Each structure stands twice: as structure tokens, then as C-alpha cells.
Amino acid sequence: MTIENKIKDLINLRGQYDGVHCAIYPNKKCIVNGREILMLIIDSIDRVEAYSVDMNDENPYFAYLVDYTNEELEYIYDCFK
């Protein structure tokens, strides 16, 4: 199973569903590339997005899992599991 699928399964298992999106929140601080990831979301077309804020200017960012390396995804998974 790929790390992307492990993350998606984790969201489906533990996520909070609002009727459109399913979201999960980290169990510990998760910082990747100077941005703190605040939640992972499965969007309306079944893609996983990471919602984060920049540590310097606090601007919000959305990124898809493909925007991260496998090493970063393993770290993200560890923060959210």
C-alpha cells in the first residue's frame, strides 16, 4: 500500500465528515517546508489536500499529496496517525 493510500485510509477511518469533505487533525505539531499542516482533507473529487499556514506570515496554503516527497508524506502520516 502506498503512503498516499495509507493517509487516505487514515482520514476515512478517523475523519470528521461534514457532508462534503472529510477532515482529520494532527496529533502533534506537523511542520513541512516552513508551513504547519493543520488538517488533511478529502475534497469533493476524492483528492487529499493538506491545509497549512506559513510559519512566517500565517498565510493559508492548500497542497495535494503529490506536492510532497515520500519522506515528507511518511512524516505527515506519523503526525496524524
Predicted feature residues:
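Residue-level detector of alpha-helical secondary structure
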Residues: 4-11, 42, 70, 74-77, ...
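Acidic, low-complexity, intrinsically disordered interaction modules
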Residues: 17-76
